[in-house]
Amino acid sequence: MIFDAIKKLFNKDENTEQIEYLGTDKDGNKIYEGYYHEFKGIPWVFNKTTYTREEFDKAFYECLEEHNVNPDTLPPLVEPEILVSYEAWIESKSQLHPNEYLYEDDELEEYDKEDGMWQVEIYARFKADNGQYFTTEEILFKIHNTMANKELGDHVFFENLVYDDHEFEADEIEDIDDNDEGIPVFVVWLGS
């Protein structure tokens, strides 16, 4: 038993967990619960534009075509709800959307401002439109529009969306219910 636990620990990929095969989505992509694909190679550039879903899809697919990325290879993110963490510069908390909160609320001290803004880590909660999984287009659309009213500096190029951990509603580990699977947290990697 101890050997199996150690074996599982060392054979586990840092960024993936395979729980259960769920079948395929409407496009024939295999769907696994709890298996998180890499989201590298998507040539998206974040900007200040707030898109409708139709406008975003048009711009997104034009971007993929321009960079010879096959949209059929884009993986789904199989979770009904996720938290996404990213860094940005804000002038005030009023820039946060209702689905967002600061990682450390106490970091907004006046003396910490640089050029009238605070550099903060933000968590955004997203729910899949179909209640089961996010398409790549859907999650990037939601992330893009959430970040559009914030300053990203020169880090505007999408590099990856990486699984980080699970967050639980309880404040103490003893308070976590055995049935609470938590909400997966992903980090947006941006480059310049």
Which functions belong to the PLM regions below?
Residues 116-138:
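Short, contiguous acidic and Ser/Thr-rich linear segments
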Residues 93, 112-114, 118:
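The transition from N-terminal targeting/processing segments to the mature protein
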Residues 13-15, 24:
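Intrinsically disordered, low-complexity N-terminal tails
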Residues 1-12:
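Polybasic, Ser/Thr-rich amphipathic helices
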Residues 17, 27-64, 70-74, 78-80, ...:
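Ubiquitin system architectures
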